[in-house]
Amino acid sequence: MKSLRLVALFCCLLPLGMAHASRIKDISSVEGVRSNQLIGYGLVVGLPGTGEKSNAFTEQTFRTMLNNFGIKVPDNIKPKIKDVAPVAIHADLPPFAKPGQTIDVTVSAIGEAKSLRGGTLLQSFLKGLDGRVYAVAQGSLVVGGLGAEGADGSKVVINTPTVGRIANGATVEREVPNSFSQGDTITFNLNRPDFTTARRLADVVNDLVGPNTAQALDATSVKVYAPRDPGQRVSYLATIENLEVDPASEAAKIIVNSRTGTIVIGSQVRLKPAAISHGGLTVTIAENQQVSQPNPLSGGQTAVTNNSTINVQQEQGRMFKLDTGATLDDLVRAVNQVGVAPGDLMAILEALQQAGAIEGQLVIL
């Protein structure tokens, strides 16, 4: 119940933090200014016997790498590759990244390697969705996990030793074109779509620059006219994105995670009049085995019988009443007085939703 009170207190205080205005750059993004995902395949070498077991796929990759270095491995020789591991590499290419700049990469084992700790990623290409190479990755891995295994099969694993990271491990080789400097307009897309917030954003821009400069297209997008000159457009956008907007109040929602028992109730939730009674039913089944011994010299056999005892205990349900316009605070206070556990509160909320007593949306994760 302490956790339930904590969640309720946090939700009650949340609107106080949102009462002040937010910068446009904090609640929206510029259309076309986005990161791009890169992916690649490579080999990590230098592992202390924790690499890949011998298989045709890894062996072929290893032979291809040596061939690229001008080393021909005879077909009748099977290389030992316990210190090598095939890996998948992925990274995010930031917007406006230029050739020569570096980005972080994440390296993950894709075979049977036990750990990448102490390994070094050899030069690997990172490609975009179009199949073109945008960066080249190489470097020593930093692995936060640790794994150890004994000769008897016992092992200890801490965190994830098969995933590592290389800070500034990839060099950008190609710039991704974008449409930022094209056209007469810039479009801001709200992180959380809302018609009221979109209108307010357009009003703030129009108040500063002039009427009809900004127009809300829908609940997400706001179109703003901007200079064509790249230098002027950057200065213009720097001014616009630092303007402050009062975001609209969030829609009334109750979020329930049935797997973890977490319940978050928004402060905008209102309840219609309702009377609620919730009682618990406990069923206990006990199994006892009884042994029956035959009389001496009777020729009988020992018999084992099961004796089951079933006990049903029903807790006395208490009823509480919610008046018109009851708020989050009223609901939490009522369930705390009754002693409802978070698991039971989920059932109560679902029942209230079915009865039409919740003025808001119930979202079950």
From Swiss-Prot:
Residues 1-21 form the signal peptide. HAMAP family: FlgI. GO terms for molecular function: structural molecule activity. InterPro entries: Flag_FlgI (IPR001782). Keywords: Bacterial flagellum, Periplasm, Signal. The gene is flgI. One of its GO terms (cellular component) is outer membrane-bounded periplasmic space. The basal body constitutes a major portion of the flagellar organelle and consists of four rings (L,P,S, and M) mounted on a central rod. Assembles around the rod to form the L-ring and probably protects the motor/basal body from shearing forces during rotation. Its main location: periplasm. Coiled coil: none annotated. NCBIfam families: PRK05303.1 (NF003676). This is Flagellar P-ring protein. It is found in: Periplasm; Bacterial flagellum basal body. One of its GO terms (biological process) is bacterial-type flagellum-dependent cell motility. The keyword Signal applies. It comes from Aeromonas hydrophila subsp. hydrophila (strain ATCC 7966 / DSM 30187 / BCRC 13018 / CCUG 14551 / JCM 1027 / KCTC 2358 / NCIMB 9240 / NCTC 8049). Belongs to the FlgI family. Transmembrane segments: none annotated. It holds the Pfam family FlgI. It comes from the Bacteria.
